[in-house]
């Protein structure tokens, strides 16, 4: 057989406790009023896959425990630490005080295209993702240290928040 899918036991999966004991990535995810619990769950799953240290759920974001989050997170809401903040700016202020560089993921006049951005080794980044309708709040953009954007070539120039988070977190993955 030329190619074969891996069996579950061949994937090297760890328990949530073992995962939490692994070295951190220096990446925090901030969800700015993301409306869909499915999207929140999918972001947890990507955060787990790419070893984000924490997810901040802000404003109207659904929070665990939630059957809808669990359905798309597949348990990643238990492996990735999370915090709830009533305002996104509260999370930004906390992360800045902890030494994170705040980067919004948004289409902005001064954004840096993702393919031209290289994360600095050892630097801590807080990646802010906006909601499905309005994106990242302008107040949050103005308070950030920078804006990064995923280059797009189609007619929509619009990716689902969970797809965007997966792409960005892969780009910032450790190693």
Model region roles, listed by residue range:
Residues 1-175:
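Post-transcriptional modification and biogenesis factors for structured RNAs
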């Amino acid at each position: 057989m030329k190619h074969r899918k891996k069996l579950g036991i061949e994937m090297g999966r760890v328990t949530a406790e073992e995962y939490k004991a692994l070295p951190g990535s220096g990446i925090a995810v901030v969800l700015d009023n993301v409306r869909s619990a499915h999207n929140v769950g999918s972001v947890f799953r990507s955060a787990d896959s790419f070893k984000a240290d924490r997810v901040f759920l802000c404003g109207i974001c659904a929070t665990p425990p939630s059957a809808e989050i669990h359905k798309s997170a597949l348990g990643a809401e238990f492996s990735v630490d999370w915090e709830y903040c009533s305002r996104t700016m509260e999370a930004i202020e906390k992360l800045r005080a902890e030494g994170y560089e705040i980067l919004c993921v948004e289409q902005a006049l001064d954004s840096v295209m993702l393919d031209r951005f290289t994360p600095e080794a050892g630097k801590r980044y807080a990646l802010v993702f906006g909601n499905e309708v309005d994106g990242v709040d302008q107040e949050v953009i103005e308070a950030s240290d920078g804006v990064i954007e995923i280059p797009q070539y189609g007619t929509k120039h619009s990716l689902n928040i969970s797809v965007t988070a997966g792409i960005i977190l892969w780009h910032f993955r450790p190693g």
